[in-house]
């Protein structure tokens, strides 16, 4: 098997059993925990922290200074931003707490905190903090239901009911 073609800054700290797929980028001073997967064409910029067990799908963008917790899922082409008023000289990352789920093509505004085990539905635009254990969806994203309800729906889907 050929070694994946990607770019990882020499001063990035990469944990054990990390898989970085083809054409992904990991920036300077980024720290990645154990058992993390980063999909093809994903861009993880400089000074990012990613907790163990997190999965970042292809074409996702994680901006500088973002903090991603443990066991987070970030769907394909999700975009976290770092400048609410571009092009500003002041930047701030996004914080995603442990166990959160970010759906495909979701966009999260700079400085937003996504709470523990919260879910951002695919295609949503998040402009405010997301409370822990809640599911948000829409443009702009609003609370739709709880993570507990989401987990029930997922189990029903997986069982084919």
Q: Each predicted region: which residue ranges?
A:
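Short conserved catalytic/interaction loops centered on acidic-Pro-aromatic/His motifs
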Residues: 115-117, 133
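Binuclear metal-ion centers of metallo-dependent hydrolases, dominated by the metallo-beta-lactamase
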Residues: 120
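Flexible, glycine/small-residue-enriched loop-and-beta-strand segment within the central core
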Residues: 1-5, 9-10, 20-114, 139-140, ...
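Conserved beta-strand-loop-alpha-helix hinge in the C-terminal portion
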Residues: 132-156
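Leucine-rich solenoid repeat scaffolds
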Residues: 125-127
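ABC ATPase nucleotide-binding domains
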Residues: 158-161
């Amino acid at each position: 098997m050929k070694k994946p073609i990607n770019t990882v800054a020499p001063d990035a700290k990469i944990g054990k059993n990390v898989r970085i797929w083809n054409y992904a980028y990991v920036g300077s001073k980024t720290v990645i925990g154990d058992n993390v997967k980063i999909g093809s064409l994903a861009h993880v910029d400089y000074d990012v922290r990613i907790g163990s067990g997190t999965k970042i799908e292809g074409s996702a963008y994680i901006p500088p200074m973002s903090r991603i917790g443990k066991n987070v899922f970030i769907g394909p082409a999700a975009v976290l931003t770092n400048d609410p008023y571009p092009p500003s000289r002041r930047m701030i990352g996004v914080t995603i707490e442990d166990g959160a789920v970010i759906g495909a093509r979701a966009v999260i505004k700079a400085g937003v905190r996504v709470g523990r085990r919260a879910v951002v539905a695919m295609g949503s635009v998040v402009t405010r903090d997301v409370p822990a254990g809640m599911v948000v969806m829409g443009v702009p994203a609003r609370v739709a239901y709880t993570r507990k309800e989401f987990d029930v729906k997922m189990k029903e889907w997986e069982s084919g009911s």
